[in-house]
């Protein structure tokens, strides 16, 4: 049995003072930010050898809580420089939006278990499972369950390979498992959220107005990534020459994406929902050589080679019987300044059916001299419709991938 607990606390104070004799004329700012994190973990482990059988197991639970608080004030017109930013009450005005406070509270509870069975120290089967419950997802899907299983075969210990001297290790391994992700969710993403939008007079009294900035989605849940892998590890000459190879395929489902929705029936014009999917596949090879191995000196040479393919499968689907669609072609990165004919400088796009983040560009054949002696770009009409359109249409082509 093992236990672990920790508490982390961080606090930051910021202050700014602009003297009355500079352009800002007595503007002051004061802010305080605090972050607290609690973590507790309890684990139980078991290990038993019975003849040719070996069983090991572990179970653990963990709880993590994170709170963030912030408060800041911006004010104008301090009467004397002697106060600095230590007497905000002496300022003449606090403009709208100059006083803010925020609070964020999120928690995560996890239960994990794993068991491994080994026969003859040759065949090994491992089963793992974890359940994660987060305060950040919807009330209908607080918990996510993520199992995995893997198998390893130590072939070198088989009789038909035992006498092959140069071969010191040969293992085959494969696995299938799931993992969860909440990267696109903040503490209150699943709730209706309002924010101040301005000040209006009501009965001669200034009143702050509020506006909706987020729809609630009680069905929001974990993104799920399912991964399959198969590989081999080979060692030669007492493992001074090592070779590893692995193929993997993963698919992320229930991807989080913000969709445009009608108002009404929704209170706000976008909704975060779990609909999209994406895949990754690849092959990795590793080579390790130890040409020198002496008591006082050792030389290791490592080389790696990998191939990876990514594909955005879909961004459209249904939410409670309502069709949710996203554009098949969406600009996500641009260049500033001159450089493209027409001033449309979007260059990086997400395109359904393509890797996530591709260069989607017009094709320039060169420069054309105009009648007045100036030059302009000669942009190719890729869709052959008689005109060049540099919007996200047919006169662009996929020129490469933005991510390595």
Q: For the regions a protein language model found, what residue spans apply to each?
A:
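Acidic, glycine-anchored loop motifs typical of Ca2+
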Residues: 373-375, 380-400
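Glycine-centered small-residue hotspots that permit tight backbone geometry or close packing
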Residues: 229-231, 353, 366, 386
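Hydrophobic beta-strand positions
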Residues: 247, 367-368, 379-380
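Short, 15-30-residue, compositionally biased linear elements
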Residues: 33, 371-374
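C-terminal substrate/ligand-recognition segments
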Residues: 404
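Extracellular/periplasmic, surface-exposed regions of secreted and cell-surface proteins
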Residues: 1-4, 8-9, 17-18, 23-338
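C-terminal beta-signal and terminal closure region of outer-membrane beta-barrel proteins
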Residues: 275-280, 327-365, 369-372
């Amino acid at each position: 049995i093992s236990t672990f607990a920790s508490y982390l606390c961080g606090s930051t104070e910021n202050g700014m003072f602009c003297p009355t004799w500079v352009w800002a004329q007595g503007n002051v700012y004061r802010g305080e930010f605090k972050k607290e994190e609690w973590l507790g973990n309890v684990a139980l482990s078991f290990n038993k050898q019975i003849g040719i059988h070996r069983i090991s197991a572990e179970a653990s639970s963990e709880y993590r809580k994170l709170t963030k608080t912030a408060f800041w004030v911006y004010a104008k017109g301090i009467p004397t420089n002697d106060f600095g930013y230590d007497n905000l009450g002496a300022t003449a005005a606090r403009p709208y939006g100059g006083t803010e406070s925020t609070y964020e509270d999120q928690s995560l509870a996890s239960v994990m278990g794993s068991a491994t069975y080994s026969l003859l120290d040759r065949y090994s089967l491992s089963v793992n499972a974890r359940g994660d419950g987060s305060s950040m997802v919807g009330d209908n899907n607080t918990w996510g369950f993520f199992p995995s299983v893997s198998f390893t075969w130590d072939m070198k210990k088989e009789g038909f390979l035992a006498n092959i001297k140069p071969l010191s290790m040969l293992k085959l391994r494969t696995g299938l498992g799931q993992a969860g992700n909440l990267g696109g969710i903040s503490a209150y993403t699943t709730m209706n959220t309002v924010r101040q939008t301005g000040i209006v007079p009501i009965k001669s009294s200034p009143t702050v107005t509020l506006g909706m900035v987020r729809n609630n989605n009680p069905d929001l849940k974990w993104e799920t990534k399912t991964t399959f892998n198969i590989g081999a590890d080979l060692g030669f000459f007492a493992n001074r020459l090592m070779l590893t190879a692995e193929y993997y395929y993963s698919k992320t489902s229930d991807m989080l994406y913000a969709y445009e929705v009608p108002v009404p029936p929704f209170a706000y014009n976008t909704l975060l929902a779990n609909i999209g999917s994406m895949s990754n596949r690849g092959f990795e090879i590793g080579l390790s050589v130890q040409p020198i191995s002496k008591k006082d000196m050792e030389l290791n040479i490592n080389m790696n080679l990998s191939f990876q393919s990514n594909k955005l499968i879909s961004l459209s689907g249904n939410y409670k019987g309502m069709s949710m669609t996203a554009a098949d072609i969406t600009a996500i990165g641009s260049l500033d300044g001159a450089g493209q004919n027409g001033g449309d400088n979007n260059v990086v796009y997400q395109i359904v059916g393509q890797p996530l983040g591709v260069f989607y560009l017009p094709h320039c054949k060169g420069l054309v001299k105009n009648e007045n002696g100036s030059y302009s770009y000669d942009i190719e009409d890729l869709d052959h419709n008689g005109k060049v359109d540099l919007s996200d249409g047919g006169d662009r082509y996929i020129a490469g991938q933005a991510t390595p």
